[in-house]
Regions:
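Hydrophobic/aromatic-rich, well-ordered segments within soluble, folded domains that form packed cores
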Residues: 76-96, 235-255, 639-641
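Short, well-ordered loop/turn elements at secondary-structure boundaries
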Residues: 80-83, 197, 210-213, 523-526, ...
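Noncatalytic, helix-rich "gating/capping" subdomain that lines the substrate-entry/channel surface
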Residues: 63, 119-430, 466-469, 481-493
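Arg/Lys-rich, intrinsically disordered low-complexity tails that mediate electrostatic binding
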Residues: 1-30, 50
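Intrinsically disordered, low-complexity linker/terminal regions across diverse proteins
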Residues: 57-60, 270, 276, 295-307, ...
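Short, surface-exposed beta-strand/loop micro-motifs that present aromatic residues
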Residues: 74-78, 204-206, 526-531
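Short, solvent-exposed loop/turn elements at domain surfaces
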Residues: 94-99, 225-227, 548
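Extracellular/luminal recognition modules and glycoprotein regions
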Residues: 35, 40-118
């Protein structure tokens, strides 16, 4: 402590800085070059104090007592403990108190990802409306027209005319004995992204998995309407009820769009055709199938499988048929082609063709979308309410024609360079940690380990948004939604045709087989992160680089590691999981594993599956955990990566042992909390059948049960429910 003294005539004039002002207790240098945004600590007390009662400003005793009570009381019932159920122990109060608005009840999984995505939809729509209000140009007119068409949807009168028009078209095709009409019909359906997945054969342009820098044509099987595939084969009461609901849905569709009693279609035929198609997977006589990549030349298609590639590509709009296509199943190609050629113009198949068009029309029509929702949303997915938010609908539909506009608006308003740099740094450091783990690996052979390290070394991180965006086409949109979607899909289809055999570029995609429709590409405004094997790259969308997934202001390394750090580790792990491990460092399909390593790896997969099955069984949930093996292994591996990163971070900073303990406890607490999720009441069955991600309770407890540090920190012993018989973290 220095004694306070005053010296005469020693006051020096400040000649280098302007006078320091004192305002509201804050010292400010008027000539400061420091951007307040760069300071993580934000002033809050002046505003926060206004929330206090007058008595609290004068006396702090009651507030102290309240805080003490909160700290001492249990935040979960005594039946829950870290030793037995860490997920519910941490999230009990959140799960108990979660409230969602009616407009959010189109969501079936209430978690941070989906709730933030819902908010992003609102933000995107606000950017659209702000631009329309502030500008008078062609773009603002096209935006206004398209948004109006989405909000109003098609009128019933217009849609009924469209339905009858498509009935006439199908009759014209099917009443001909010319088999070329079949391929014209198939090509016509595949030229529209909204309905292509319903066709018996689905054409698509995608990166060639054995030459991933170029596109090629793929022929995929039909995307089946019923999510639980076993229903098509089973005759149980559950399966019969499921099929009955689908038949009712089809009947409602035909009767509503064509008029009850005004058509001769038997809606039951739709299910019969889908059953015929699904049984072709088991047909015999084709032995050439090798995995999901089967190259079929133009001549082979017709000579060996009867598949008229020449006529189909002509109908699609090709001037010359590509020399080959790739398919995932030669059995399906062979047998589904035979059935289709034999029955395509029968009354049963005629109903099926008409159904493909009717379901699209209903989806874009005011009130008729309810038909789609009732089966695909409410019955199949457990959705509590149909989406009736104009902002959500506008953002989803307008992302197809205006992706570049939306991307630029989102970057302009939400890009945080500091956060992007933080994520980039974390990506590179976590990759180093993962590579170190692989170097220490004891069960991989030297050959396989060398390739694994090469693959990790060459992973590309794309953070925030894609570097190149194509110009949005302004196609003279009107206020008719069906016509607008036709215009943009026709434009996109022509561009897809031009890409066949050409170098790959980024294309924003939509999954129209999902309900509600979802974005499936690398749109910057999606709240997600993903690994793409064909590119050996990890894309972290800008929509994900925000609170609560990363906090640059008030949280520490433990918080960010548990959130975005864990996600990065998860995506890194996908490079070596059951799917990613089939591709090399350049993104091409290549078998770089020794037979012995494959055998060990498969054994580990089975052991992981058994743990997820066992943990679910304790809650009386029976499901096939094998569908999520890649995701489950990525979770386990990611936890090991962040564990080691935090250890190194503490070593670097020479952290006190007591603080290290608190640091790890914070990491695991934040991890459990960021995994919190509430399912809609009737959504569980669909999630277990279709979602490759396990329920978040198991995504939390199982990776933690394999962490040696977690086990030691919480003194987990054999007999505790958080105990597992090994702490193997795969790599």
């Amino acid at each position: 402590t220095r004694k306070n003294t005053t010296r005469k005539n020693t006051t020096r004039k400040n000649t280098t800085r302007k006078k320091i002002k004192i305002t509201q207790g804050l010292i400010k240098r008027e000539d400061s070059l420091i951007d307040p945004k760069c300071v993580s600590l934000k002033p809050f007390q002046a505003k926060f104090e206004k929330q206090f009662s007058k008595s609290l400003v004068k006396s702090n005793q009651s507030f102290k007592k309240k805080i003490a009570r909160q700290l001492l009381q249990q935040f979960a019932p005594t039946r829950l403990s870290p030793k037995n159920d860490f997920y519910n122990y941490i999230n009990y109060m959140w799960l108990k108190n979660l409230e969602v608005s009616d407009k959010q009840k189109y969501i079936v999984q209430f978690d941070d990802f989906r709730l933030v995505q819902d908010r992003v939809y609102q933000e995107l729509d606000q950017h659209i409306m702000d631009y329309i209000k502030s500008n008078k140009n062609r773009l603002s007119t096209e935006l206004k027209n398209f948004r109006t068409s989405v909000v109003n949807m098609n009128t019933k009168e217009n849609s009924r005319k469209l339905a009858l028009k498509h009935v006439d078209y199908v009759n014209e095709m099917c009443n001909s004995n010319d088999e070329n009409k079949l391929w014209q019909l198939l090509g016509h359906i595949n030229s529209d992204e909204m309905i292509a997945s319903s066709a018996p054969f689905v054409w698509s342009i995608a990166p060639n998995e054995k030459q991933s820098t170029n596109y090629c044509s793929y022929i995929y099987p039909h995307s089946f309407s019923i999510l639980d595939i076993n229903v098509y084969f089973d005759k149980s009461s559950y399966a019969n009820n499921y099929k009955s609901e689908f038949r009712k849905h089809c009947k409602k569709l035909f009767d509503t769009l064509l008029g009850k009693g005004n058509h001769n279609f038997n809606p039951n035929d739709v299910l019969d055709v889908e059953i015929e198609l699904i049984y072709t997977y088991d047909c015999k006589g084709v032995m050439e199938t090798k995995g999901n990549y089967n190259k079929v030349t133009k001549n082979e298609a017709m000579d060996k499988y009867g598949f008229n590639w020449e006529e189909l590509t002509k109908a699609l709009g090709y001037k010359t048929a590509p020399s080959f296509f790739v398919t995932s199943s030669l059995e399906y190609l062979n047998c589904a082609t035979k059935i289709m050629k034999e029955k395509w113009n029968s009354e049963k198949w005629k109903t099926y063709w008409v159904w493909i068009f009717l379901r699209q029309i209903a989806r874009v029509t005011r009130d008729w979308e309810e038909i789609t929702y009732k089966f695909h949303g409410e019955f199949q997915r457990g959705q509590e309410k149909i989406n009736y938010s104009d902002s959500v609908s506008a953002s989803l539909y307008m992302s197809v024609p205006f992706n570049t506009f939306l991307t630029n608006q989102y970057l302009k308003n939400h890009k945080n360079p500091k956060a992007l740099l933080y994520v980039k740094t974390l990506c590179e450091d976590l990759k180093i940690v993962f590579m170190r783990i692989i170097k220490r690996n004891k069960w991989l052979s030297p050959k396989t380990k060398k390739y694994a390290l090469l693959k990790l070394k060459n992973i590309e991180f794309v953070i925030g948004h894609m570097a190149k965006l194509r110009e949005d086409p302004l196609l003279g949109y009107t206020t008719n939604l069906y016509d607008n979607m036709k215009k943009i899909h026709t434009w996109r289809h022509k561009r897809f045709i031009e890409l066949d055999g050409k170098p790959t570029i980024d294309i924003p995609l939509m999954d129209w087989s999902a309900y509600p429709v979802k974005m499936a590409g690398n749109q910057a405004y999606v709240v997600n992160a993903s690994y793409t094997p064909a590119k050996n790259s990890i894309f972290i969308n800008l929509g994900y680089i925000q609170k609560p997934f990363i906090d640059m202001d008030e949280r520490g390394i433990e918080y960010n590691l548990a959130n975005i750090g864990f996600t990065i580790g998860h995506e890194l792990s996908h490079a070596l999981d059951d799917w990613g491990s089939k591709y090399d460092d350049k993104g091409n399909l290549y078998d770089w594993w020794t037979p012995k390593d494959k055998k060990i790896f498969k054994k580990m997969q089975n052991e992981v599956t058994s743990q997820y099955t066992e943990f679910a069984k304790r809650d009386k949930i029976i499901y096939d955990a094998a569908i999520g093996i890649g995701e489950n292994m990525a979770d386990i591996s990611a936890m090991a990566i962040v564990d080691e990163y935090l250890r190194d971070f503490q070593e670097k900073n020479n952290t006190l042992p007591a603080i290290r303990s608190l640091s790890y406890e914070a990491l695991y607490t934040y991890y459990a909390f960021q995994m919190k999720q509430q399912l809609a009441t009737n959504a569980l069955a669909a999630q277990l059948k279709t979602n490759p991600h396990a329920l978040d309770k198991y995504r939390t407890n199982i990776p933690l049960s394999r962490s040696q540090i977690f086990r030691a920190l919480f003194n987990i012993k054999k007999g505790d429910k958080m105990w597992w018989n090994n702490t193997n973290t795969i790599w």
